[in-house]
Amino acid sequence: MAAERYTFGMEFLSCDPSTGETVYTRPGWSVDRLQQAISRLRQHQHAWRGRPIDERVARIRRLGELIEANVDRLAPVITLEVGKLIHEARAELEKTARLCHYYADLAPTLLLPQTIPTSASRSGVSFEPLGLVFAVMPWNYPVWQALRFAVPALAAGNGCLLKPAPTVPQSTALLLELMQEAGIPVFDVAWIDVDAVEAAIAGCDAVAFTGSTRTGRLIASLAGKHIKKTVLELGGSNPVLILRDADLATAAQECAMSRFRDAGQSCNAAKRLIVVPEIADDFLQAFMAEVTRLTPGDPRQPGTTLAPLHRADLRDQLHDQVTDACRHGARCLSGGQVPDGPGFYYPATVLDHVSPACRIYHEEAFGPAASILHAENEADAVRLANDTPFGLGAAVYSQDLPRAERLARDIEAGSVFINRHTSSDLRLPFGGVKASGYGRELSEFGLYEFVNVKTFWQR
């Protein structure tokens, strides 16, 4: 199907990526219905913010329990709509349930007013909800990303209006059902297309967006026009520095897992593998051994280790990047061809000697294609890591920890992992710099994004 159908159509549509067949459709909303939903949410939010924090988090904890109890029901739907491996869909849901429990435990303490000594008899800050948070979320983690923004916002007393990707309506509808069963009346789904996004932004008090940098610029522009607090989690082209004293077996295994998990469709995946001369050949050999073990196939089957891409246009875009790289001097060590047959499959592709002449050097590669960059030395490796418009995450593999930490401080990224692939941890803030966005999700920092930190001062 044409990309425009997914992006601009008022119809929400599930298409099985493993076959290319349409399996479900639902109509979108009118702007009038959107305005009615916003008005209804505002009424509920006024009551929700007045509830004791212990009651709010009890319902969030109940949501986590419901997700845990419904993994077997939800995971196949995510696999059907997104195309991800069934065990990866289950892992997404299990992590989301832990998110609910984490904030249910944390929020009551973090949202207590804080006393700050000044010349006043009493002064400090309180944490109050902003109101309604409107979120535009992508398709690749339809439950995790929806709740990564919503759970802390709800705990703080906000209401949440979610615009899901138009290709995951069934996953989203099931999430809404669990929200209602948990007794959370201040979460709703806006079944709208992009033409109605500005109306939603204007009607709400803050905006959260996860997706491409290009769309993020549009969201930021609309939010700025209406002076709305915004958190943007955008694209990434995460570098991984493999230094001369790295544990190559571990680095190769984890780089392959990070790059090809979820068919490479993660903003936080390892995408640019930067090697120094001393270990380049040995690392490549170990990495290719991991890549050749990947088995494409039906994502529902336990033996499959490489899933299809989500849409045909995403596969076309990735293949164009790979073809361009080969045309500009990169060596294709594996993959690089669109396979025959149904579905949106693309083979695990490794491009060696990717240079600045290649589009994939500068652009985010959202699929199973790894770029190998050759650095002259460690300083050059850091230069290559920073030679990108993105700044989401990065990793450094070295057994010399002080040196690895020193290099990590020079990398322009929202997070740097040493001797581990980039990932997100509930207890740590997640977000980027540069064209990867601003604001943070997860941890206490994610909780404070959508509150009014109100100063109080008493004579």
Residues of each region from the PLM?
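Structural signal for hydrophobic packing residues in well-ordered secondary-structure cores
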Residues: 45, 49, 64-67, 71, ...
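ALDH superfamily catalytic-core signature
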Residues: 183, 214-355, 418
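A short hydrophobic/small-residue beta-strand
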Residues: 159-161, 332, 415
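Conserved C-terminal structural/oligomerization subdomain of aldehyde/semialdehyde dehydrogenase
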Residues: 19-25, 241, 295, 327, ...
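Rossmann-like NAD(P) dinucleotide-binding subdomain of oxidoreductase/dehydrogenase enzymes
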Residues: 114-250, 375
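Short, well-ordered beta-strand elements within core beta-sheets of diverse protein domains
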Residues: 22-29, 44-50, 135, 240-243, ...
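Residue-level signal for inorganic ion chemistry
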Residues: 20, 56, 78, 100, ...
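N-terminal Rossmann-like NAD(P)+-binding subdomain of aldehyde/semialdehyde dehydrogenases
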Residues: 1-121
